[in-house]
Amino acid sequence: LQKRNRAINKENTQRKKDGKAVIPVIPSPEECCAPRLQAELRSFPHILAFGTAAAKATIHRSASIMGLRGAPTEVERDGRTIRIMPCLHPAQVMREKRWTHVFRSDLKKAIKWFSSGLDWIPPQVVYNPSPRDLKAFLTREDITYYTYDVETDGIECLTARIRCIAIGVPKFVHVIGILSINGQGRFYPPDEEIQIKEVLKEFFLDRGALKAGHNAGYYDRIIVEKWLGVTPEPLIDTMLVHRLVESELPHSLGFVGSLYTNAPSWKTDREGRKKAYGSETDHELHEYCAYDVAITAEVLPELLDKVKSRQQQKLIRCDHKLQEVCADMHTIGMRVDQVKRKLVEKELMKEISDRRIKIRDITGNGNLNPASTVQLRDLFFDRWDLIAPLDEKDRT
């Protein structure tokens, strides 16, 4: 079917140039069955969506099951709100046993949500507090630990600029806006921003205040060092803690939060796209950052209990020390012999050119780009008429 539709699309390209009517492509079985499926689902207020195909059919055609699984999702259909719980497909769980308890956890959460609702309450958020209010919050004696998170305008922590920083506990979070998503706007007057930074410096240097965060011992640490000139301590990185608890599973905060809390899908939208990179307003980004902090604070106690029950305290200390070394190595960098690098670059570029010429000679296509999946697809399956390997036994 795909091969036939590719041929139709090629023909339509020429027909458009010739001013002729285009030929409709052949619909897939999923597209043919979609109207009936939607009609059958219309009477159900609660849906368990197992696997990517089910998530695409019930939530959004671009939905990703790994980005949405375990996250309670509400969809508006025909004036009604439908509750959908995306879960891994049972076949995947049977093949990959490490997902078994994740699958059971998602089902348990779905049953609770469908029957009585979830008990997760969003944190109370204070946006852009004054220096005085921020200091009062960060010096409260009844708080045993704080979690924090930063949002930036880039992925590389040595060059990224900080947009906001959030600090808090499971139910209360303060978000300090620094740089607008437009790259120019600020949230404090210059003199007040200086005061805010001084309060934050005192907080991060206060050894009596335990700090925690997800990947905070690496990315967030380097951002804070570059921005404030201080190293946060003492610090617990929940990503390292979860690595000891469940070494074979993903360690992203979205995954950990979906497993240990009843929070909705705050990391991604319904299409599975990360909100950290796609927020349209400063408020959306700041709210996202606040949720990161609250959920990190919520999962930390249970993760630490599991580490203690496994007697992994020595391992977690070792992991944090290694992380410190890695962060310092990233900051310092390494010496590069530029003369030798340039020599190796020339050798590799010549090898690439020679291989490209050889490939084009073999294929008889002087314009072939070996890095183009589209061109290779047409070459392998249209021109050479090869059969794509469907099973492991067919691979050569």
Segment roles from a protein language model:
Residues I23-E31, P122-P129, Q184-E193:
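Short, flexible loop segments at the rims of nucleotide/cofactor-binding pockets, characterized by
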Residues P170-K211:
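Nucleic-acid-processing active sites and adjacent nucleic-acid-binding tracks
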Residues I59-A71, I84, L88-M94, G168-P170, ...:
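Metal-dependent phosphoesterase core characteristic of DEDDh/y 3'-5' exonuclease domains
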Residues M85, Y145, L210-K211, E233:
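Hydrophobic "anchor" residues on beta-strands that sit immediately upstream
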Residues A34-Q38, K135-L138, L200-K201:
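Short hydrophobic/charged patches on amphipathic alpha-helices used for structural packing
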Residues K109-R186, Y218, E248, Y260, ...:
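Conserved "right-hand" nucleotidyltransferase catalytic core of DNA-directed polymerases
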Residues L1-L118:
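A polyanion-binding, active-site-adjacent surface
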Residues P45-G51, T147, G208-G217:
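Acidic beta-strand-to-loop metal/phosphate-binding motif
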